[in-house]
């Protein structure tokens, strides 16, 4: 199949056409029965990933770490966390991945490091240490009536409370936008940047990785002076820092500099991809990040569609939304690419999101499978690089009715403590928070992978091991890889079929452009068209438990039904009525 680059102005690339499978190493596969996933466990399941239809794996942080934030607090960028294995285990995993014809992408967490990293230990040792300026140190704004130091500004940590931690030794605060053991690195310091590139990027390029997923890549450039943030949450003394930390004044310069380092470092001709987690950005800013001619990022993740239904003031507050809101937000992932040399991504799940069937489908026993397949139809029909998160291909759902004590996520625990302190355990704020985490907590994605219905650990660990985190009880209900592999009607086998369809029609599924909504205001129907050369793809997707009617664009008879989530024997291709949670893809040539 020849991919034309006439429109949009894009070149075919391996990373554009790839389906990338994300692995959360702690929860994927435990090879030695210590309760934690590991490198050898991942290696043992690479064939499973290949058979699914994935072209690359992205592994969340596996570096040496105190694990205060599940490895996103890195103490040594050049060492594998011993619980996950050795560096040699990782190098062997990279080699096996390549032998199977897949690419290897690793996580790049360089907005912050761990407070156990040698860089920070040196920095905090004294005010005159040469690495003092590698982090953000500031004196207290003052002292309260009890003599406690007041943080330098009103910025809120993403994990609740102030974004500053007081260090007794030097009597100054350090900035940490995440948890107290994740000090932010000061990218204004050139020596700091060079050390980051060499240790976190260069070391792994030298060992054969094919790309980097760049964690919170929009936060490196803080506004000079670190001023107070505007008050948008009247119920808290801590405010979102986004206006002064996100997409800051030097952010594009920093990404261009790092991209140049990558290009200069790789000598064997392999093309390295970078995908930035850029949270929120205008279309123009997204184009600046991902324009091929600017040499910053290959593509980016945007959060608009996963944040629908959550308050901009505080994500753990749910607000009403309709299907139209989600449709518009989802299109923000890729519409800015049209007619440019930019690129983007398609995803519904990752390690920071709940299970998509619970969030956007219907996880009831009656509709879990069919709505899970519908979400698969949607994803394979959209343009951009497709990402699938471990367990998504099984149709995993959120765990149910867990008490707060079972949650592991530092974001949940810190926000719970902050709300309890500020408003009380029985407050309406706490009730809203608990309702929200039942739907959107990151922990829903982090339970151990469900390989079988083997008791008590679903094949993740041996029966005598104690996994690091509780299992989702749904493995006993058939939501596991072993049972689903034997069931031709399972979500797993449907995903294999869906990815084959996407590859067979990659010209219009991956590279399609001129996306247009049809019947945007419809509260149950998600339908659209997009084009590639002389082809048009039309998708009609029923996001409800009712049968609904739809119309083919221009009533054209040239559209042929190519793919859907109901068995073809049950579908009348000429029918204009969709069954509950039915999705169809038509193509006209």
From Swiss-Prot:
Signal peptide: none
Site, Transition state stabilizer: residue positions: 352
Catalyzed reaction equations: Hydrolysis of (1->6)-alpha-D-glucosidic linkages in some oligosaccharides produced from starch and glycogen by alpha-amylase, and in isomaltose
EC number(s) given by UniProt: 3.2.1.10
Domain of life: Eukaryota
Keywords on record: Glycosidase, Hydrolase, Maltose metabolism
UniProt-listed InterPro entries: Glyco_hydro_13_cat_dom (IPR006047), Glyco_hydro_b (IPR013780), Glycoside_hydrolase_SF (IPR017853), O16G_dom_2 (IPR045857)
Any one GO biological process: maltose catabolic process
Entry's induction text: By ethanol.
Active-site feature positions: 215 (nucleophile), 277 (proton donor)
Similarity field: Belongs to the glycosyl hydrolase 13 family.
Function recorded in the entry: Alpha-glucosidase with specificity for isomaltase, methyl-alpha-glucoside, and palatinose.
Protein name: Oligo-1,6-glucosidase IMA2
Originating gene: IMA2
């Amino acid at each position: 199949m020849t991919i034309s680059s006439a429109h949009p102005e894009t070149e075919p690339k391996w990373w554009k056409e790839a389906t990338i499978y994300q692995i959360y190493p702690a929860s994927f596969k435990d090879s030695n029965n210590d309760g934690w996933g590991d490198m050898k466990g991942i290696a043992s399941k690479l064939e499973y990933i290949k058979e699914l239809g994935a072209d690359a794996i992205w592994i969340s942080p596996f570096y040496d770490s105190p694990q205060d934030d599940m490895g996103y607090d890195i103490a040594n960028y050049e060492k594998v966390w011993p619980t996950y294995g050795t560096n040699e285990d990782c190098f062997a995993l990279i080699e096996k991945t390549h032998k199977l014809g897949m690419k290897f992408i690793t996580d790049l967490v360089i907005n912050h490091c761990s407070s156990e990293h040698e860089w920070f230990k040196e920095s905090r040792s004294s005010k005159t240490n040469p690495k003092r300026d590698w982090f953000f140190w500031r004196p207290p704004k003052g002292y309260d009536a009890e003599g406690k130091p007041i943080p330098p500004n009103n910025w809120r940590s993403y994990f609740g409370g102030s974004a500053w931690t007081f260090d007794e030794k030097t009597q100054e605060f350090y900035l940490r936008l995440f948890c107290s053991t994740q000090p932010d690195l000061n990218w204004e310091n050139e020596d700091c940047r060079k050390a980051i590139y060499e240790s976190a990027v260069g070391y792994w390029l030298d060992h054969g990785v094919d790309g980097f997923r760049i964690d919170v890549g929009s936060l490196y450039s803080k506004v000079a002076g670190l001023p107070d943030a505007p008050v948008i949450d009247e119920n808290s003394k801590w405010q979102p820092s986004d206006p002064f930390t996100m997409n800051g004044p030097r952010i594009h310069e920093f990404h261009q500099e790092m991209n140049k380092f990558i290009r200069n470092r790789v000598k064997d001709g392999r093309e390295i991809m970078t995908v930035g987690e850029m949270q929120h950005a205008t279309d123009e800013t997204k184009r600046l990040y991902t324009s091929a001619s600017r040499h910053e990022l290959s593509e980016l993740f945007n959060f608009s569609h996963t944040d629908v239904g959550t308050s901009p003031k505080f994500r753990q507050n749910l607000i009403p939304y309709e299907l139209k809101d989600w449709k518009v937000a989802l299109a923000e992932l890729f519409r800015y690419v049209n007619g440019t040399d930019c690129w983007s991504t398609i995803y519904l799940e990752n390690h920071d999101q709940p299970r998509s069937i619970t969030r956007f489908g219907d996880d009831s026993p009656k509709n879990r499978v069919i709505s899970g397949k519908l979400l698969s139809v949607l994803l394979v029909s959209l343009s951009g690089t497709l990402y699938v998160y471990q367990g998504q291909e099984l149709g995993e759902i959120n765990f149910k009715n867990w008490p707060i004590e079972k949650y592991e996520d530092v974001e949940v625990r810190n926000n719970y403590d902050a709300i309890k302190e500020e408003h009380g355990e029985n407050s309406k704020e706490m009730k809203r928070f608990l309702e929200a985490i039942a739907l959107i907590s990151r922990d829903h994605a982090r339970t151990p992978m469900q390989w079988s219905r083997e008791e008590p650990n679903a094949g993740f660990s041996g029966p005598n091991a104690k996994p690091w985190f509780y299992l989702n009880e749904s493995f006993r209900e058939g939501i596991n890889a072993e049972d689903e592999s034997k069931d031709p009607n399972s979500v797993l086998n449907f995903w294999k079929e869906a990815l084959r369809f996407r590859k067979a029609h990659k010209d219009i599924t991956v590279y399609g452009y001129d996306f247009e909504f049809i019947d945007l205001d419809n509260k149950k129907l998600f339908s659209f068209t997009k084009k590639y050369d002389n082809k048009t793809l039309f998708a009609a997707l029923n996001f409800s438990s009712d049968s609904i009617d739809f119309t083919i664009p221009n009533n054209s008879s040239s559209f042929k039904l190519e793919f859907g989530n109901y068995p073809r024997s049950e579908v009348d291709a000429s029918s204009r009525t969709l069954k509950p949670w039915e999705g169809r893809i038509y193509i006209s040539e």
